[in-house]
């Protein structure tokens, strides 16, 4: 009997020793960096709780429209961003590479193209070409015949790793982000866990067909938006809960500064709307465990070794803020319901609606602007 008990305890010991060795010593390839976030702002005052985004309806399908109803897999999944043309037609890119066009009533018109990658940020240029930040294939342009033209796949000799979002200036220059030159789209979680400054803000000049790096050492460079006067460009740094401003005109040209920081969530895409409002999509609210582990790279490496299903993720929570050109919060839009349309990855404003992208839904979201609070 004693011999049997000994064998059992020895087997348990070996199992635990193996598990501990795996969690602490197994190489991950990550080099997590310690960082020190500010205390997360409370959801009160300018970020007070509300359910305004409960007014979102699923859009971009001929069937199943309605609050939070996940649509049958017909057009694809994951419309991360939405572009809206002057006629109210909408364009969105999906997992698998398809880009689809819908009319203003949400009726499917046609497939624009298939990039064969992962189209993320979208914008229409001044002659109607659709410019696409494709995470896998770089910066692309799609003409009215559906022809795909690769604009750039590198900047100053360094290949694009994760092309994310873009905005187009009136002179045709395209400002765009490379979220991480080190970690690609399928491995974005690694960039979050590592918290290394692998992101870049870039500009492509169609006249010279050259790409220039404007800012580097960004912490997951995500959404990009030009100011209405085109004197500066904003880029979201998801992993730092902040938005950075880069001046492209004036006496500060070529310099950067923090536009707004210590946000209550993870900033994803950003766009400029009417009345000079910058709409910032927050992928989800801040997580206590993420901030707790910020200065503990050893523990983050252990967490990374755990099964993917055990990794902490933001809860289902719709969150969007609108700020003015000084970074002051003007709109605070939320829906904390577990059934909310979330995570929201982008916001685009038209005359009558706000449109919302998401990585998980089969359609994108839409809400009447009449539902916005009066400020």
Regions found by a protein language model. Name each.
Residues 2-375:
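Sequence-structural signature of mature extracellular/luminal beta-sheet repeat domains
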């Amino acid at each position: 009997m004693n011999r049997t008990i000994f064998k059992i305890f020895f087997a348990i010991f070996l199992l635990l020793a193996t598990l501990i060795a795996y969690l602490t010593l197994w190489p991950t390839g990550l080099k997590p960096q310690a960082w020190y976030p500010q205390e997360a702002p409370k959801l009160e005052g300018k970020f007070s709780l509300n359910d305004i985004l409960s007014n979102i309806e699923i859009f971009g399908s001929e069937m199943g429209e309605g609050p939070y109803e996940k649509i049958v897999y017909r057009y694809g999944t994951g419309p991360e961003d939405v572009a809206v043309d002057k006629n109210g037609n909408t364009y969105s890119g999906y997992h698998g590479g398809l880009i689809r066009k819908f009319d203003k009533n949400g009726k499917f018109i046609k497939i624009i193209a298939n990039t064969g990658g992962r189209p993320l940020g979208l914008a229409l240029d001044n002659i109607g070409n659709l410019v696409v930040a494709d995470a896998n294939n770089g910066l692309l342009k799609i003409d009215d015949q559906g022809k795909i033209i690769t604009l750039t796949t590198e900047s100053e000799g360094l290949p694009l790793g994760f092309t994310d979002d873009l905005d187009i200036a009136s002179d045709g220059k395209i400002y765009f982000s490379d979220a991480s030159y080190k970690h690609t789209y399928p491995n974005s979680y690694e960039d979050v866990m590592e918290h290394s400054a692998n992101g870049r803000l870039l500009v492509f000049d169609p006249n010279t067909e050259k790409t220039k790096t404007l800012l580097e050492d960004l912490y997951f460079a995500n959404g990009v938006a030009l100011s209405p006067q085109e004197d500066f460009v904003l880029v979201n740094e998801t992993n730092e809960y902040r938005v950075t401003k880069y001046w492209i005109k004036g006496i500060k040209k070529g310099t950067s500064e923090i536009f707004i920081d210590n946000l209550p969530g993870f900033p994803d895409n950003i766009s400029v709307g009417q009345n000079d409002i910058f709409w910032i999509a927050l992928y989800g609210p801040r997580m206590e465990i993420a901030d707790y582990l910020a200065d503990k790279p050893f523990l983050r490496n252990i967490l990374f070794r755990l099964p993917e299903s055990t990794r902490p993720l933001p809860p289902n929570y719709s969150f969007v803020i609108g700020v003015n050109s000084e970074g002051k919060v003007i709109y605070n839009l939320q829906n904390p319901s577990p059934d909310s349309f979330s995570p929201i990855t982008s916001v685009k404003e038209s005359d009558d609606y706000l449109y919302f992208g998401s990585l998980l839904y089969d359609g994108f979201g839409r809400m009447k602007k009449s539902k916005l609070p009066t400020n």
